[in-house]
Structures are given as structure tokens and as C-alpha cells.
Amino acid sequence: MNAIEIKNLTKNFGQKQALCGLNMTVPVGSIYGFIGENGSGKSTTEKILCGLIHPSSGNVKIFDKEHTNIDVRSKMGCLIEMPGCFKNYSVWNNLMLQAVNLNIQNPEEEVRKVLKLVRMEGAASNKFKNCSLGMKQRIGIAMALLGNPNLLILDEPINGLDVDGMRIMREIMIDLTTNHNCTIVVSSHVLGELEKVATHYGIIRQGKMIKEMAAEELEQSCRTYVAVKAKEINKTKGVLSCKYNKVVEDENEYIRIYDIVTPEEIVTYLYNNDILVNEVKTDKISLEEYYIDLMNEKGGK
């Protein structure tokens, strides 16, 4: 059984088709990185999963039940946008109000539990308006965790956060899936951060799923390149470009060679052209680079 199974999902807004036969499978216990450019259909899919909008057609099952099933809905938590909180209320009072509205038994105990999960026990008395962006995002996750959900839908939870905020968010997601029987679907444009936590990926383009894979498959799919660093960057790049098909300079002043070649061959070739190499290494392309390659292959950005 999977946490989510979507088949042939469509959604129309007037004449505009936002989802065009989307298929999606999210394994139980995974952190599923949901990736796509703006307007690709990510948010529409997440809103359908959360019951905020209805699909035009297709089948959506959550834990093998229809996504509209009341038992399913009670075991889901969603953070689709900045949480709607009373700005002059404390963090504690905002969460208590939500817990009472959800008819949660022992609301005080539940609020204490979710505050601990999102690393905010010490900020319970803070007014919402005085909280940082990262804290507000964590308050939203705390609200979504009320009721002990098995599935969490997070739309762009790390965008705009500083380094420490992103680290805390990563730790929270890993803790929830590892220790609290939770499956997470998380969308983000910060692919470098997503790559650090995701166990599975789904890449969507123009309302269709173009690739789903486990993190292990991504690791195997990412092509290897050789990177060299030499004193004369432009000369090095020019010499390498005369022999190899794809040679690029990265942001760290390494020259990358994507052809199938060994580091020893590169060093020897440059030495024969009077260029001494300061450093040479092999590496694999990142999730972001893989995504860009895939979009180019499919005719996207």
C-alpha cells in the first residue's frame, strides 16, 4: 500500500487545463520531493490532496481510500500557505484555538507535543506577529501536526528561510518520517535543500508527471563529470574545448568536462599543452542540474 496513488488526474479552470492526466505514487514513510516550475501544477495537486479544491476527473487514493473519506482527512495535515493566525495572540493560544476547533482530546497535551516536534517549546509565549519567517513556517507545521497525522503536505516550507531555518526544517521532516510514522510530500524551488532530505522525487511539467524516482535512482542517473582547477582559467577552458564536447566553468572556478574521460587523461592532455593543474576531481551533477537537463530534454526551461 502506498500513502498516495493518483491516476489520470485532471483539473480545469475554465478553458485552462492545470492538470492533464497526472499520475503520482508516494510510498509510505517517504519524504517525497515534488518539483516543478511555477504554473506546472504542483500547488493544484496539493490543494486537491488537501481537499481545498475538487478534481475535474481522475482517481485519488490516500492510504488505499478515496481522498474525500472522512477518516483519511482526519489523518492529514496541510501547510499550503502561511498559517492563518491571530497576530496578537501568542503561539500557544493560536495552537490551542486550532486544537479546540479540531475537537482534539487533551488539547494542552497535544499543543505541548507539537511545539516540541517543531523545536518551539521556548517560544510558546511569543506573539505571532513577533515571530520570524522560519518560526511562522514551523507554527504552520505545528498546526498541521495537531491530531497526529500520518500524511503531511507542505508547499514551499523552506523558501525564504536562512541557513539555520532550513537546517531546522530538515531535521523536523527527518524526525517526523523516522520516528513518528509520517509520510511527507514537500514542494520547493530550493532543490539543494530538497536533495538533502528527500527519499523520493516527482517532477511535474505542464500538468503531467514526467519523472518519478527514488533517491537511489537519482544517484545512479546523475552523470559523472571531471572538474579541474588551473591558474589560467580561460586558457584551460579554451584548450579543453578544442578536444571535448561539453566544457563549462562553474561558480567555483572549476572547469567541468562532461565527456567520458578519466582525470588522468585530462591532466596529461593539459600538461602536454603547457597547463599545470592545481586540482582535479570527479563528481556527479546535483538534483538541480539533473532537473535542468530533464527540462531541456522535454522542451522546458
Q: Residue locations for each model-derived region?
A:
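ABC transporter nucleotide-binding domains
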Residues: 4, 11-186, 191-205, 209-211
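Surface-exposed charge patches
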Residues: 97, 113, 238, 268, ...
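Residue-level detector of short coil/turn "hinge" positions at structural boundaries
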Residues: 106, 122, 247, 271, ...
